[in-house]
């Protein structure tokens, strides 16, 4: 059998005009050029492994091993991209290289018939992932109406696919603020509201805090500052001195270094109509409810939320654990990216391709 003759040039493999009919028009491999067909390194490796072509470098024929080693020298993450490309092809997708790594066409479609629907970015489980770059990649995909998929290759070359999208969660809770300012005391690492009427209203209609007894309400630090900022409670120290907003923030930040970041996300979620409670049992900052109609019949929370700074770098094993836990308890995993007074959300979930 005569194989197509190709040449390795830089980070591309070049084939003659006959390859256009044999490879592009039948399988949509490569990109037609005036003098033939240009293949990416992963496309060429895939085709070579299936006995479709010979690859030469400076007149020397390269076997699969030699070409794979050359390709790995010429393109960062080549072996990872090859693993993902091969997997997607074997699932029946048409796949083409892109700036994101790959663009993937819907099953039953191909280039020329419809547009690609998915951008796939490839990483090793050991590589950090910048939140800033991730948000830019997701925005670029969403701006052209594409789904953004992160393909993570673990040390045993198994693949996990994550869909990542921006989110704008909206809740349905009215704010049941009492008409009076309730007195509260900042103890060691929490606040207690003493007014029975205000405590009952905040707990039963807004799911704030936890009742210490039938008349008094325990509040977390973020809950307390939010209610303080709304003029619902007056917070004093244990000697009776009234805190200013800045004094409260300073004391809370001494207790918890990331307090102000957590508060920014808490405030954004409450302002958008959600009930926000601690996510400690799930290993996250918050669990979030879209609506709680009755304390006696609390529904399942919709989201788990971790709050991160905009210069954060994901460690993929940690991200994987958070997403897997959220999926296992039928919740969405949101990462709230704190940007000063603004909060943006990334919704990350595992998907099957």
UniProtKB/Swiss-Prot annotation:
Keywords from the named record: Lyase, tRNA processing
Lineage: Archaea, Methanobacteriati, Methanobacteriota, Stenosarchaea group, Methanomicrobia
Assembly description: Homodimer.
Pfam families: tRNA_int_endo, tRNA_int_endo_N
UniProt keyword Lyase present: yes
UniProt protein name: tRNA-splicing endonuclease
SUPFAM superfamilies per UniProt: tRNA-intron endonuclease catalytic domain-like, tRNA-intron endonuclease N-terminal domain-like
GO cellular component: cytoplasm
Enzyme Commission code(s) on record: 4.6.1.16
